[in-house]
UniProtKB/Swiss-Prot annotation:
Catalyzed chemical reaction(s): 6-carboxyhexanoyl-[ACP] + L-alanine + H(+) = (8S)-8-amino-7-oxononanoate + holo-[ACP] + CO2
Subunit record text: Homodimer.
NCBIfam families membership: bioF
Family per similarity comment: Belongs to the class-II pyridoxal-phosphate-dependent aminotransferase family. BioF subfamily.
Record's protein name: Putative 8-amino-7-oxononanoate synthase
Origin species: Phenylobacterium zucineum (strain HLK1)
Gene3D superfamilies: Aspartate Aminotransferase, domain 1, Type I PLP-dependent aspartate aminotransferase-like (Major domain)
Length: 386
């Protein structure tokens, strides 16, 4: 007989104590976003540099009005999965607009970015296949790859030579191959070399999935990272509605038969309630703003570059600037110091980032003023020199 298990509560208590000892325990902190930049937390108003609402559209009057009007006419929730009665016409309209923006034949929306990659990859990959994943790709890509049952192979970050070598070693025995990467990496803000990755994937008869969650609305004139690499063949262009669009959910753009199969067989589409119509309406209004306001689209990167210039860091490629501090304790101390100064920059710790690379992940918004960026740079300087 095996030894009796601890109670579930005792097991959890031990796990939490171990995390606490490593400064890795997470705690929720109630936070209200009062506008596109500032938050209320612990009774204080803080300028936030930890929100992915890159264009400030979650609080844009046109976006809120569109969502409110949809609630009035369509109700709050979808009521069922899309294959039952949840396929509100606003969802198809949003999919057509996303596909047109991305230059794809069709699109499918999802409940979240995590659900998207958790569902997409197992739809196309399985036992006998290989999935090659950038080592710094988002957790949802890793989750979908592992869930698929395919052999999952990590390649060094943005290292096309390493990708080529690993494809060469494994491709011959595999039925199908998929290369999966972030477009803009969520914790570092750098951009994948998609032209070279695409050429390598094609040379080894592999499909390419790109997660453009942090590119849409920010890079490539708002179209996303694919617009920076027009020659790249991206078979599955996935992204979110929850970052620059200021809404919630996700999408994937691809060829029409690919999308048809996703809508028929992907478990995170078939077996879950559809996105609320109001979310689709708000996202549609946000797309209009991205298309018609190029200065707003350019602003987050300009703010990020002002910050990197002030701190003597490499020029920002996106709206994200990592301030890598090393151990978790230092990152937590730096975050607390900034919060005392009225600035919110949440510490990011393992396992979200690799060991010894705990950091403050700075997310710049179109609504940040230059003086707010300068205040942040001044507050960060002592930690850069420590």
């Amino acid at each position: 007989m095996p030894a009796p298990m601890d109670s579930l509560a005792a097991f959890a208590t031990d796990k939490l104590a171990a995390l606490e000892s490593q400064s890795l325990r997470r705690r929720l902190r109630p936070t209200r976003r009062t506008d596109g930049v500032c938050v209320e937390r612990g009774g204080r108003r803080l300028v936030s540099f930890s929100c992915n609402d890159y264009l400030g559209l979650s609080h844009h009057p046109a976006v809120k009005a569109a969502a409110a009007a949809a609630i009035e006419s369509e109700g709050l929730g979808a009521g069922a999965s899309r294959l039952v009665t949840g396929d509100n016409p606003l969802l198809a309209t949003l999919e057509r607009r996303l596909a047109a923006l991305k230059g794809a034949e069709a699109a499918c929306v999802f409940g979240s970015g995590y659900l998207a990659n958790l569902g997409i990859i197992p739809t196309f990959m399985g036992a006998g296949d290989i999935v090659l994943v950038d080592e710094l790709a988002h957790a949802c890509i890793w989750g979908g790859a592992r869930l698929s049952g395919a052999q999952v192979i990590s390649f060094r970050h943005n290292d096309v030579d390493d990708l080529t070598g690993k494809l060469a070693a494994a491709r011959g025995s595999a039925r199908r191959a998929l290369v999966a990467t972030d477009g803009v990496f969520s914790m570092d803000g750098d951009i994948a070399p998609l032209d070279d990755i695409s050429r390598t994937a094609q040379a080894w008869d592999a499909w390419l999935l790109v997660d453009d969650a942090h590119g849409l609305g920010v890079v490539g004139g708002g179209v996303g990272v694919g617009a920076l690499f027009p020659s790249a063949r991206i078979d599955l262009s996935m992204g979110t509605l929850s970052k620059a669009l200021g809404a919630y959910g996700a999408y994937v753009c691809a060829a029409q038969p690919v999308i048809d199969l996703i809508k028929s067989r992907t478990r995170t589409v078939v077996y879950t309630t559809a996105l609320p119509p109001a979310v689709a309406a708000g996202a549609l209004a946000a797309l209009d703003i991205i298309i018609t306001e190029p200065k707003r689209v350019a602003a987050p990167r300009l703010r990020a570059r002002r910050l990197t210039r002030s701190l003597g860091l490499p020029t920002a490629e996106s709206a994200i600037v990592p301030i890598v501090l090393g151990d978790a304790e230092t990152a937590l101390a730096a975050a607390a110091d900034l919060e005392r100064q009225g600035l919110l920059a949440v510490a990011i710790r393992p396992p979200t980032v690799p060991a010894n690379t705990a950091r403050l992940r700075i997310a710049c918004s179109a609504l940040h003023t230059e003086s707010q960026i300068d205040d942040l740079a001044a507050a960060l300087q002592p930690w850069m020199q420590a």
